[in-house]
Amino acid sequence: MASSAEGDEGTVVALAGVLQSGFQELSLNKLATSLGASEQALRLIISIFLGYPFALFYRHYLFYKETYLIHLFHTFTGLSIAYFNFGNQLYHSLLCIVLQFLILRLMGRTITAVLTTFCFQMAYLLAGYYYTATGNYDIKWTMPHCVLTLKLIGLAVDYFDGGKDQNSLSSEQQKYAIRGVPSLLEVAGFSYFYGAFLVGPQFSMNHYMKLVQGELIDIPGKIPNSIIPALKRLSLGLFYLVGYTLLSPHITEDYLLTEDYDNHPFWFRCMYMLIWGKFVLYKYVTCWLVTEGVCILTGLGFNGFEEKGKAKWDACANMKVWLFETNPRFTGTIASFNINTNAWVARYIFKRLKFLGNKELSQGLSLLFLALWHGLHSGYLVCFQMEFLIVIVERQAARLIQESPTLSKLAAITVLQPFYYLVQQTIHWLFMGYSMTAFCLFTWDKWLKVYKSIYFLGHIFFLSLLFILPYIHKAMVPRKEKLKKME
């Protein structure tokens, strides 16, 4: 009788669990449908916003507490977010973190450990891309794993630098070099920190340890006075979120593949690509602004003080919104968008390739790494190839205008400044959209179809300028200017 009752009770509990899970799935799915989003996208947004209650709990109950409690809290909350989004597939991140800890401990501060880390973590990520690849953008475990991959590679390099003589390191390397030996709990807390696990930003182990040890504060002995700065970034993120949610059903990359798009005049196709190219980036802007607010709230965003003594909270800023919205150059967009990832690539890839003795080659290899890091689709390679080409041409054009007396005088005419700005912004966002077309459509058959519809305008325009500008420079820059430059 007792065993029968216990069995019935177990069945009821199991059934209740299944029903609860089913209702949760149903309600989330229904809500996502009503919002015009996928369930995975809704889970992602919920998880990002969960960082705020987690940060408030940390501020009120764990700040200045024992460090192991803080590491446990970060690990538990990060794992919970991973499970909520990806279920049992959280084992991918857990496995890579544990193996990374073993690499550091068993191989020590050696170049072998760095190379092993780079090869293993990148191979695991690329294998994940290969086995989960589809023709569309899907939110799956590889999304946070690409963030984790950079964290763990950076951890290995900083640990390696920590064993070198201080004098042999640059000031930047000294700042990030890890002198101590991280424990497994510290590595887990660093990796799973809820404010950055899903979509970034990137930050170093040293910066994370300063947070845990209560050093990232603007007033000694008190909780960071960061609520207002955090709310400002949250509000800005919500503004972009609302705008993106309202407009996303009307401005889609799928429309680029339709016959209706092909049947419109050439100018319309270009203008749609321009508007879509700007708009499509707003989903990334939204996520990064919201997560930056979480980082600021915890104190991780603390970045010292300004000259006037005002605290700076931009250590985890992934966006410079004003620069992003107003700068008419491609290099301005690069400097204002995904800042921490770009800084990571500059610190751990570009500057480490200095031995090649060729800045363009180092930049090209860095962009190749970024393309592979994003995924195996051909569209990523095309996008970053276009970025490389555009930046080179933009620098050539800027140098020509600066060194040519005629063009310098024309550029300085005040009344023409608004016209110049409009032309620059039009070129800027048209070809940003052109590059993003390959990035967002992934597969060669899709982006090739769209590029054909606008006659490969971006490639023809910038490749032509790449070869023509040196001759224009030769014709328009006086010889004395060239000699002065050589001196």
From Swiss-Prot:
Location of N-acetylalanine modifications: 2
EC number: 2.3.1.-, 2.3.1.23, 2.3.1.n7, 2.3.1.n6
Pathway annotation from the record: Lipid metabolism; phospholipid metabolism
Membrane topology reported for the UniProt record: Multi-pass membrane protein
Bilayer-spanning residue ranges: 44-64, 84-104, 111-131, 180-200, 227-247, 285-305, 364-384, 422-442, 453-473
Any single GO CC term annotated in Swiss-Prot or TrEMBL for this entry: membrane
Keyword Oxidoreductase: no
Regulation: Activity is inhibited by thimerosal.
GO biological process, one term: intestinal stem cell homeostasis
Written domain comment of the UniProt record: The di-lysine motif confers endoplasmic reticulum localization.
Entry function: Lysophospholipid O-acyltransferase (LPLAT) that catalyzes the reacylation step of the phospholipid remodeling process also known as the Lands cycle. Catalyzes transfer of the fatty acyl chain from fatty acyl-CoA to 1-acyl lysophospholipid to form various classes of phospholipids. Converts 1-acyl lysophosphatidylcholine (LPC) into phosphatidylcholine (PC) (LPCAT activity), 1-acyl lysophosphatidylserine (LPS) into phosphatidylserine (PS) (LPSAT activity) and 1-acyl lysophosphatidylethanolamine (LPE) into phosphatidylethanolamine (PE) (LPEAT activity).
Protein name: Lysophospholipid acyltransferase 5
Organism per entry: Homo sapiens (Human)
Encoding gene (name): LPCAT3
